[in-house]
Regions:
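Amphipathic, small/basic residue-rich leader segments at the start of a protein or domain
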Residues: 1-96, 119, 123-126, 276, ...
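Glycine-rich phosphate/cofactor-binding loops in nucleotide/flavin-utilizing enzymes
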Residues: 2, 78, 82-83, 103, ...
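Glycine-rich beta->alpha junctions and the first turn(s) of the following alpha-helix
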Residues: 3, 7, 204-301, 374
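C-terminal helix-coil-helix/basic helical segment that borders enzyme active sites and/or dimer interfaces
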Residues: 28-38, 275, 279-286, 297-358
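Internal helix-loop-helix
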Residues: 49-128, 168-175, 296, 310-323, ...
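A short, Trp-centered hydrophobic/proline-enriched beta-strand micro-motif
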Residues: 127-135, 179
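Glycine-rich phosphate/pyrophosphate-binding beta-alpha loops
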Residues: 140, 165-170, 212-213, 373-380
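A short core secondary-structure module
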Residues: 148, 156-157, 161-207
Length: 407
C-alpha cells in the first residue's frame, strides 16, 4: 500500500488548491450544505452551479484523466483522485454535470464510435449539454437485467417506451443515457442496448420525487414513443449490458479516496455535538466514537489499497472499473455511513428531530436521511457481497431461481 502520490500529482494538488483559493466563491461554499425545501441546492439547474462548472472548464479542470485528443488533460488516475480530494477539502460544490463528466464521458471514450465521441464529448466538457442516467425501473433495480423499457427501430430512429425511476437531475437534463430492450427474444442480458435519448421532446414526461431530505433531484421519467437517432447506440446493438457494467464501475470507482475524507470531517462534527452536550466522558459514547474513527481509518486503508493496486497495474481512466475493489469499498462505506449517522442523531437527542422553517434540515439530519439510500443506489450491499464473494473469495455463483443446487 503506497500513500505517496508522487511528485507530479502533488504538484497538481498544490496548483489546484491555489486555484480554488482564488476562484471558489465563499457564498458557494456555504450553499453546499443548504438543503432548505424552499431553496434546494441539489441540482445543476441552479445558475451558480453552472457558473462553477464553466470556471472549472475554462481553467482546464474538467476531464482531468480524459485523453487529450478528446479535450481532456490526459493526466493519470492519481491526478483525478487528487482533484476530487481537493474539492472535498475545500467544501467546493460538486461538478454540476457530474453524471456526464464521471460516468457517461468515460463510457463513450471506451465504447463509443468516432462520430459519438465527436458529437458528445465536447459539449459534456464545456457544460453545454446536461445528462441523466436512465437505468433503474419500478421493477428493475438490483435485478437490472429485468428492465422492461423497449426500443423499436423505425426507419432511422429508435422509438423508446417505458418508465425509469430515481433518475437524478432528469428535470433539467438535455439527454438521458438509457438502457432499453432492443431484442425481446434474447436472454435478459443479451437483448439490451445502451441508448442516448434526447429529453426535450413530446414523448418524454418527467415527474420529480420529493424526498424526506426536502430535495427533489430524483425523478420518474416516462418514455411514450420517444425518439432517438439510430446512431445513438453506444457499444453496439444488444451489447448494452457490457456497456452499463462499465458505467456502473465508473460510478463505484470515481471517488476512490474521497469518502473517508468527507466522513472524517462529518465525524469531527459529531464529536463536537457530543462535546457540546457533555457526553464525551460517557464510556458508551467514547466506545462508539472510537469505533467510528477506526472504521474511517479502515476506509482510508481500503481506498489506498485500491489506488495502489490500480496504479501498480498501470490502470488509467478506462481500467478503474475492474475487479472487486470498488464493490468492497462501496459496501463498507455505505453501511458505515448509515451506522454513524444513526450515532450522530442519537447524540443530538430530541434536537435531532426538529427542523427549521420551510423544512430546513441540518447537514447532519440530511446525512442521516440520505444515508438510508446509500446501501441501495450504485448496487445494493447484497449485490456487492455477491461480487466480493465470487471474485475475491472464489465462492460459487449465486444460484438462479429454479436452479438445481443439489450436489
Amino acid at each position: 500500500m503506497d500513500f505517496d502520490y508522487g511528485e507530479a500529482a502533488e504538484k497538481f494538488r498544490i496548483d489546484f488548491r491555489h486555484w480554488l483559493e482564488d476562484n471558489l466563491d465563499p457564498d458557494w461554499r456555504a450553499r453546499v450544505g443548504d438543503v432548505n425545501l424552499d431553496n434546494p441546492a441539489a441540482g445543476a439547474d441552479h445558475p451558480w452551479l453552472r457558473e462553477w462548472d464553466r470556471r472549472l472548464y475554462e481553467a482546464g479542470y474538467k476531464g482531468i484523466a480524459w485523453p487529450a485528443e478528446y479535450g481532456g488533460r490526459g493526466l493519470s488516475l492519481l491526478e483525478q483522485v487528487v482533484f476530487h480530494e481537493e474539492l472535498v477539502a475545500a467544501d467546493a460544490p460538486v461538478v454540476a454535470n457530474f453524471l456526464a463528466d464521471t460516468l457517461l464521458g468515460p463510457t463513450i471514450i471506451k465504447w463509443g464510435t468516432d462520430a459519438q465521441k465527436e458529437r458528445f464529448l465536447g459539449p459534456i466538457l464545456r457544460g453545454e449539454e446536461f445528462w441523466c442516467q436512465g437505468f433503474s425501473e419500478p421493477d428493475a433495480g438490483s435485478d437490472l437485467a429485468s428492465l422492461a423499457t423497449r426500443a423499436v427501430l423505425d426507419g432511422d430512429e429508435w422509438v423508446v417506451s417505458g418508465q425509469k425511476v430515481w433518475t437524478t437531475n432528469a428535470h433539467f437534463a438535455d439527454f438521458c443515457f438509457c438502457l432499453a430492450r432492443t431484442d425481446p427474444q434474447a436472454s435478459p442480458h443479451k437483448g439490451i442496448s445502451f441508448l442516448l435519448v434526447p429529453m426535450k421532446q413530446p414523448g418524454v414526461t418527467v415527474r420529480p420525487l420529493r424526498q424526506p431530505t426536502g430535495t427533489d433531484e430524483f425523478n420518474e421519467v416516462f418514455f411514450d414513443e420517444a425518439r432517438a437517432p439510430v446512431g445513438n447506440v453506444v457499444g453496439g446493438l444488444n451489447n448494452g449490458w457490457a456497456v452499463a457494467m462499465t458505467t456502473l464501475g465508473f460510478e463505484r470507482g470515481s471517488s476512490v479516496t474521497t469518502q473517508f475524507l468527507s466522513y472524517r470531517r462529518e465525524l469531527d462534527e459529531i464529536v463536537e455535538v457530543a462535546r457540546s452536550r457533555g457526553l464525551l466522558d460517557d464510556p458508551v459514547v467514547r466506545r462508539d466514537l472510537a469505533a467510528a474513527y477506526t472504521k474511517v481509518a479502515i476506509m482510508k486503508a481500503n481506498a489506498y489499497r485500491t489506488l495502489t493496486a490500480l496504479t501498480a497495474a498501470g490502470a488509467d481512466l478506462q481500467d478503474v472499473t475492474g475487479g472487486f475493489h470498488p464493490s468492497l469499498n462501496k459496501m463498507f462505506w455505505s453501511e458505515y455511513h448509515q451506522w454513524v449517522t444513526d450515532l450522530g442523531m442519537n447524540l443530538r437527542g430530541p434536537a435531532g428531530l426538529v427542523v427549521g422553517d420551510g423544512y430546513q434540515v441540518t447537514s447532519q439530519q440530511f446525512a442521516f436521511l440520505f444515508a438510508r439510500s446509500e446501501t441501495i443506489w450504485g448496487g445494493t450491499s447484497q449485490v456487492q457481497r455477491n461480487i466480493v464473494g465470487e471474485r475475491l473469495l472464489g465462492l460459487p455463483k449465486e444460484p438462479k431461481p429454479g436452479e438445481n443446487t443439489q450436489r
